Design a protein with these regions (language model features):
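Extended, highly charged
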Residues: 1-302, 306-390
């Protein structure tokens, strides 16, 4: 029987025991474009363009400029791997997530020593430097800078205290500065930052990197499935049958995922916006899941970093767009959301949902119906039209 997956390390151990699902290399790689380029050819079957191909996840043990650190990429870039990691038949992943949303297990705060705080670097240290502490790759030569693509951003609403976890676009801008992009009107932490700004306050935030895949998948839910006040860490708790463990941050009034590989602590600064490519001046941000390189934003918020903590010999986890990893993270929660909405409207009719790779997990869904009456045909067409318009 396979060992239980509780964090990134146990997830990688499971993949190691699955033939053809993980490649590890000790060859030195540059984090600037080379690491992602090697993965594209070896792990992504030669391309990350649509239609994407599946290949093994990779671990790079020798990243130039970052002794003792490793980088994992492509962990979720296969529905087969996601199914194994979540102990579910790949075709039933959407249904499993749907039931997890409806049966949440909220996270709990632990008082035990947190693995993510085995090594502590504070911004007040004279040699503190994000560029050196965090082996964040620059995926293409025109990227705005080194990106943290799988950071679990965790913050709490200034008024209600309700917490939320979300993945955001994070770019290293300086020794103790990150830019964060909030899609206008579409993200809970963005709304929290706006409210904190109205109050003239900084918003404490933690960014946990290298976590249980259940957390990464669960964090990709969006409203209305998970409205404001719903902590998506509770989805991961339901998927695992036990609560996600949080620890208190050391330098800000927020919590972080206790068994993460890295945690970046900081505060979102009010009334400050930065140009995303202020250091590279390329005009671009990074490759996005639909298949294009997005333009750099001039409306990114600024995070002032106060600390970086990590495990001993930490593993940085990253992804590159557009890839099957995005299809898994965006698509499977979307399947769950569609399944839930249609099930409420047409109980027992919808058999399954699949968000296919050509749509990047968001723009194409295949719905399997069980038609019991002639009128079901019209209902089916209605849902198809509604989804096409949206």
């Amino acid at each position: 029987m396979a060992a239980k997956v509780t964090d990134l390390r146990s997830a990688l151990k499971m993949l190691e025991d699955m033939p053809g699902q993980l490649i590890e290399t000790d060859v030195e790689v540059e984090p600037m474009a080379e690491l992602s380029g090697v993965y594209r050819h070896v792990g992504a079957g030669g391309t990350v363009m649509r239609p994407t191909k599946e290949g093994p996840a990779m671990i790079f043990n020798n990243v130039k400029g970052h002794p003792g650190a490793r980088v994992a990429i492509g962990v979720l870039a296969s529905r087969t791997r996601v199914g194994a990691l979540l102990e579910c038949d790949p075709k039933d992943l959407g249904k499993k997530l749907y039931h997890s949303v409806d049966n949440p297990i909220p996270p709990v705060l632990t008082e035990e020593a947190a693995p993510c705080q085995e090594v502590v670097h504070k911004a007040t240290d004279p040699d503190f430097d994000l560029y050196k502490l965090v082996p964040a790759p620059t995926n293409t030569p025109v990227d705005a800078g080194p990106y943290i693509t799988l950071g679990m951003c965790y913050a709490s609403h200034p008024d209600t205290g309700a917490s939320d976890v979300t993945i955001h676009r994070l770019c290293i801008q300086g020794k103790d500065e990150l830019s964060i992009f909030f899609t206008p009107g579409a993200r809970h932490i963005g709304a929290m930052a706006e409210r904190a700004e109205e109050l003239g306050q900084r918003l404490p935030i933690s960014i946990s990197i290298g976590v249980d895949p259940a957390i990464e998948i669960g964090s990709c839910f969006e409203p209305p499935t998970t409205p404001m006040g719903y902590d998506e860490l509770a989805v991961a708790g339901a998927l695992r049958g036990e609560a996600v463990r949080l620890c208190k941050c050391l330098t800000v009034n927020e919590c972080a995922i206790a068994n993460a590989e890295y945690v970046i602590e900081g505060e979102v600064v009010p009334n400050v916006r930065v140009q995303e490519d202020q250091n590279s001046h390329t005009g671009y941000a990074m490759p996005e899941f639909p298949g294009y390189t997005g333009p750099a934003s001039d409306q990114c918020w600024m995070i002032k970093v106060t600390a970086v903590t990590h495990r001993k010999n930490p593993i940085m986890q990253t992804c590159i767009g557009p890839s099957e990893e995005h299809v898994s993270m965006a698509g499977i929660p979307t399947e769950a959301s569609i399944y839930g909405m249609v099930e409420k409207a047409m109980p027992g009719r919808l058999q399954n949902v699949y968000c296919a790779s050509p749509g990047g997990g968001k723009y194409m869904a295949v719905l399997q119906f069980k038609k019991l009456t002639a009128s079901d045909e019209d209902r089916q067409h209605f849902w198809h039209s509604l989804h096409s318009v949206s």
